[in-house]
Swiss-Prot record:
<comment type="function">
    <text>Plasmin dissolves the fibrin of blood clots and acts as a proteolytic factor in a variety of other processes including embryonic development, tissue remodeling, tumor invasion, and inflammation. In ovulation, weakens the walls of the Graafian follicle. It activates the urokinase-type plasminogen activator, collagenases and several complement zymogens, such as C1, C4 and C5. Cleavage of fibronectin and laminin leads to cell detachment and apoptosis. Also cleaves fibrin, thrombospondin and von Willebrand factor. Its role in tissue remodeling and tumor invasion may be modulated by CSPG4.</text>
</comment>
<feature type="modified residue" description="Phosphoserine">
    <location>
        <position position="597"/>
    </location>
</feature>
<dbReference type="GO" id="GO:0048771">
    <property type="term" value="P:tissue remodeling"/>
</dbReference>
<keyword id="KW-0356">Hemostasis</keyword>
<feature type="disulfide bond">
    <location>
        <begin position="152"/>
        <end position="176"/>
    </location>
</feature>
<feature type="disulfide bond" description="Interchain (between A and B chains)">
    <location>
        <begin position="567"/>
        <end position="685"/>
    </location>
</feature>
<keyword id="KW-0597">Phosphoprotein</keyword>
<keyword id="KW-1015">Disulfide bond</keyword>
<dbReference type="InterPro" id="IPR018056">
    <property type="entry name" value="Kringle_CS"/>
</dbReference>
<feature type="binding site">
    <location>
        <position position="432"/>
    </location>
    <ligand>
        <name>L-lysine</name>
    </ligand>
</feature>
<feature type="disulfide bond">
    <location>
        <begin position="124"/>
        <end position="164"/>
    </location>
</feature>
<dbReference type="GO" id="GO:0004252">
    <property type="term" value="F:serine-type endopeptidase activity"/>
</dbReference>
<feature type="domain" description="Kringle 5">
    <location>
        <begin position="481"/>
        <end position="560"/>
    </location>
</feature>
<feature type="binding site">
    <location>
        <position position="136"/>
    </location>
    <ligand>
        <name>L-lysine</name>
    </ligand>
</feature>
<keyword id="KW-0378">Hydrolase</keyword>
<feature type="disulfide bond">
    <location>
        <begin position="502"/>
        <end position="543"/>
    </location>
</feature>
<feature type="domain" description="Kringle 2">
    <location>
        <begin position="184"/>
        <end position="262"/>
    </location>
</feature>
Length: 810
């Protein structure tokens, strides 16, 4: 069984001024290599381990791994190109970039890739061989030139680039066709451009990707870890014809950059397919009809649709004829259509080797489900967990079990048919300590999931808990339990999960250690031999053990029970249906407990709203246009059915209305009496001021609005929608510049899912770490669930200061 890691606080080791050597490495948390040629050494830090790798003389060190708690360094001759990556707990794998790269910089003097054929297709002779050609350059005469195997190299600094002696007796040597690295130039559309150009075509300075000034945006580096959004360098994260950036000019949001094209052929993009695999970016079949039966327009044509997805702008995307393709990272192949009324549509491409996943058929007439009042949790070690959580303890999105990107692995549905490896849901296929998943972050191979163990009663229908008011900030109780990952735990447990006594933190027997001691971590509570979590390990409190053969282990410290209901944490797990309020699904009853039905004084539902505190509801300003009098409105809380209201529903009058002073489509309602917070009525959390939701974040809308003939009318429905970055949403083919910076877009561009009339004012919530945060108020759209016309929502974070001021002063 493979082992796994927990997130390491690398900042503990990356001291200022000492991190430069590590810039030459790619690091992956929670990963190890099957290595044959290796050395195991002791090192006090990651930098010390890197130095040992650089100093190694007996073999070429291409990678090393560092165990933080054990202070163990393993240097290795292999890397991911010659070995298999596995998961391992408490390990970070560092691989030298130069040995992973298959491109050259300049004349390729430092090229260390594995190309072993010349540009004329002749196999290279081994550098250590003397047949058929006696070499002038060999590993013995030039030991620092990387003359391994028969790989192309440039030991003599030849201006024409890497070369090799050939296995053809008639040709002593030949040059190799190594593509240029995308540092000074770009291949294709610059999706992999890695250079440092930071000015636009017109000479404007680029805004840093991690800055929200002068332009707020959703391309947040931590949310797009595979897009290399460094500093203010030009990049192409969204399928434009070439790299671009946001500018430092407040009057110019973004502009393309002038990156020259590389003169060498681009690297191979991998195998191509005649069927649909993944999102179809490598589909090269001949389907030329959309899902609605429209004929595709030729990519080189500009009639009837004018566009910039041309063969010239996307030279590597094989935009031949009018065949369906995916040149810009959409969710599936598509094309512009020859119907002037339909700009573009997705295509129906047969899947490679598997039938489409069937979706659950939902009964629109079914009564509200009697769902247990429980949080999503797991029993035992979680091998039986079959929930839909897909977020790790640090908030990272899980990689699909059937995907090999960004992490190649063997934990597939085919290899583990009984493990429930569906979509990207958290699972425990290998009997680990709890559910986990591979992450979509290339630098973090896997993490445990943001789930808690079920208590004795969770998982079965239980009586509703007592009614309580909203909590103040939680403080640890005297009970021996922990909050979160237990970094603040100061209890007196001193045995591991296996019952082994802990070694005292100040002791050096049986295990020597220097990083986690009372002297180095005086505020971490490292007293006696008590379980602690000084490094914020997401696995929870741990200790060095008194077993000489077991360096450290985790402790079994339970989570503290919350004494009240926290904002954004429903007591019923939402369904989170992946389907396309039009085209969504009926929600689990009371799984969105902040949902408000805004009604006329006669009881007619006409808008949605969101409970944000016991006395306050947030809604859209346009919902209040018919009357400025609070007495015209009332709110319904805790409802699942629109008409036949359940007995527990709370009906409260509105005492005051507050419209946003700059006329944004957002308003506050003060209730005549505070709502009673129960398991069915819980506020949503507000975001941080000016927080920007990253593009492609999956969020949820809910409401009773118009369903346009789809199922579930009269019951609360939900739909999952991706946020669309405003830059994309404002493209000509979508909303054509209509979306303001105080608004956000969300929706499926193919249509079929949207909020409609009657959903106005309702919530768009996004899951962040362990709770749902209100990021949007349903505002407007061009039609309802139309293709290419996503819904528009007021960006709540831009108005948090106003919201809090109104609530505080009234």
């Amino acid at each position: 069984m493979e082992h796994k890691e927990v997130v390491l606080l690398l900042l503990l080791f990356l001291k200022s001024g000492q991190g430069e050597p590590l810039d030459d490495y790619v690091n992956t948390q929670g990963a190890s290599l099957f290595s044959v040629t290796k050395k195991q050494l002791r090192a006090g830090s990651i930098e010390e381990c890197a130095a040992k790798c650089e100093e190694e003389k007996e073999f070429t060190c291409r990678a090393f791994q560092y165990h933080s708690k054990e202070q163990q360094c393993v240097i290795m001759a292999e890397n991911r190109k010659s070995s298999i990556i596995i998961r391992m707990r408490d390990v970070v794998l560092f691989e030298k970039k130069v040995y992973l790269s298959e491109c050259k910089t300049g004349n390729g003097k430092n090229y260390r890739g594995t190309m072993s054929k010349t540009k004329n297709g002749i196999t290279c002779q081994k550098w250590s061989s003397t047949s058929p050609h006696r070499p002038r350059f060999s590993p013995a005469t030039h030991p620092s030139e990387g003359l391994e195997e028969n790989y192309c190299r440039n030991p003599d600094n030849d201006a024409q680039g890497p070369w090799c002696y050939t296995t053809d007796p008639e040709h002593r040597y030949d040059y190799c066709d190594i593509p240029e690295c995308e540092e000074a130039c770009m291949h294709c559309s610059g999706e992999n451009y890695d250079g440092k150009i930071s000015k636009t075509m017109s000479g404007l300075e680029c805004q840093a990707w991690d800055s929200q000034s002068p332009h707020a945006h959703g391309y947040i580096p931590s949310k797009f870890p595979n897009k290399n959004l460094k500093k203010n360098y030009c990049r192409n994260p969204d399928g434009e014809p070439r790299p671009w950036c946001f500018t430092t000019d407040p009057n110019k949001r973004w502009e393309l950059c002038d990156i020259p094209r590389c003169t060498t052929p681009p690297p191979s993009s991998g195998p191509t397919y005649q069927c649909l695999k993944g999102t179809g970016e490598n589909y090269r079949g001949n389907v030329a009809v959309t899902v609605s039966g429209h004929t595709c327009q030729r990519w080189s044509a500009q009639t009837p649709q004018t566009h910039n997805r041309t063969p010239e702008n996307f030279p590597c995307k094989n935009l031949d004829e009018n065949y369906c393709r995916n040149p810009d990272g959409e969710k599936a192949p598509w094309c512009y259509t020859t119907n002037s009324q339909v700009r573009w549509e997705y295509c129906k491409i047969p899947s490679c080797g598997s039938s489409p996943v069937s979706t659950e058929q939902l009964d629109p007439t079914a009564p509200p489900e009697l769902t247990p009042v429980v949080q999503d949790c797991y029993h035992g070690d979680g091998q039986s967990y079959r929930g839909t959580s897909s977020t790790t303890t640090t908030g990272k999105k899980c990689q699909s079990w059937s995907s090999m990107t960004p992490h190649w692995h063997q934990k597939t549905p085919e290899n583990y048919p009984d493990a429930g490896l569906t979509m990207n849901y958290c699972r425990n296929p290998d009997a680990d300590k709890g559910p986990w998943c591979f992450t979509t972050d290339p630098s973090v191979r896997w993490e445990y999931c943001n789930l808690k163990k079920c208590s004795g009663t969770e998982g079965s229908v239980v009586a509703p808990p007592p009614v309580v008011q909203l909590p103040n900030v939680e403080t640890p109780s005297e009970e021996d339990c922990m909050f979160g990952n237990g970094k603040g735990y100061r209890g007196k447990r001193a045995t591991t999960v296996t019952g082994t006594p802990c070694q005292e933190w100040a002791a050096q027997e049986p295990h020597r250690h220097s990083i986690f001691t009372p002297q180095t971590n005086p505020r971490a509570g490292l007293e006696k031999n008590y379980c602690r979590n000084p490094d914020g390990d997401e696995g929870g409190p741990w200790c060095y053990t008194t077993n000489p053969r077991k360096h450290y282990d985790y402790c079994d410290v339970p989570q503290c029970a919350s004494s009240s209901f926290d904002c954004g944490k429903p007591q019923v797990e939402p369904k989170k249906c992946p389907g396309r309020v039009v085209g969504g699904c009926v929600a689990n009853a009371h799984s969105w407990p902040w949902q408000v039905s805004l009604r006329t004084r006669f009881g007619t539902h006409f808008c949605g709203g969101t409970l944000i505190s016991p006395e306050w509801v947030l809604t859209a300003a346009h919902c209040l246009e018919k009357s400025p009098r609070p007495s015209s409105y009332k709110v319904i809380l805790g409802a699942h059915q629109e008409v036949n209201l359940e007995p527990h529903v709370q009906e409260i009058e509105v005492s005051r209305l507050f419209l946003e002073p700059t006329r944004a489509d957002i308003a506050l309602l003060k209730l005549s009496s505070p709502a009673v917070i129960t398991d069915k009525v819980i506020p949503a959390c507000l975001p941080s001021p000016n927080y920007v939701v990253a593009g492609r974040t999956e969020c949820f809308i809910t409401g009773w609005g118009e369903t346009q003939g789809t199922f579930g009318a009269g019951l609360l429905k939900e739909a999952q929608l991706p946020v669309i970055e405003n830059k994309v949403c404002n493209r000509y083919e979508f909303l054509n510049g209509r979306v303001k910076s105080t608004e956000l877009c969300a929706g499926h561009l193919a249509g079929g899912t949207d909020s409609c009339q009657g959903d106005s004012g309702g919530p768009l919530v996004c899951f962040e770490k362990d709770k749902y945060i209100l990021q949007g108020v349903t505002s407007w759209g061009l039609g309802c669930a139309r293709p290419n016309k996503p819904g528009v929502y007021v960006r709540v974070s831009r108005f948090v200061t106003w919201i809090e001021g109104v609530m505080r002063n009234n």
